[in-house]
Swiss-Prot record:
Main location, first listed in the record: cytoplasm
Gene of this entry: rhaM
Source species taxonomy: Bacteria, Pseudomonadati, Verrucomicrobiota, Opitutia, Opitutales
Record: residues binding substrate: Y18, Y41, W76, W77
Subunit structure: Homodimer.
Catalysed transformations (reactions): alpha-L-rhamnose = beta-L-rhamnose
Protein name, per record: L-rhamnose mutarotase
Species this chain originates from: Opitutus terrae (strain DSM 11246 / JCM 15787 / PB90-1)
Amino acid sequence: MIRKAFVMSVNAGCEAEYERRHRPIWAELAQVLKAHGVHNYSIFLHPQTRQLFGYVEIEDEARWAAIARTPECQRWWKHMGDVMPSNPDFSPVSADLREVFHLD
């Protein structure tokens, strides 16, 4: 399994709405994630900075990248675009994090 981590942010005043939209995520989006080899996916919020820390385990980088091309993912991005900084293609502004420690 490949471990990945990334950071995003939520717009000021939108924290509760961001959480509400994830409880739960759409069933069809969850199915796409699982079908593309996604496991153990979590997002954490740091309330003082509004930073979102994502952690996910994936089976394959190509399958992970392919999620972005699915209609479900693109629809989700548009749905979330008003509560978080987004790129022109509606994907969330994010930065990958480099692992500096791991203990099994």
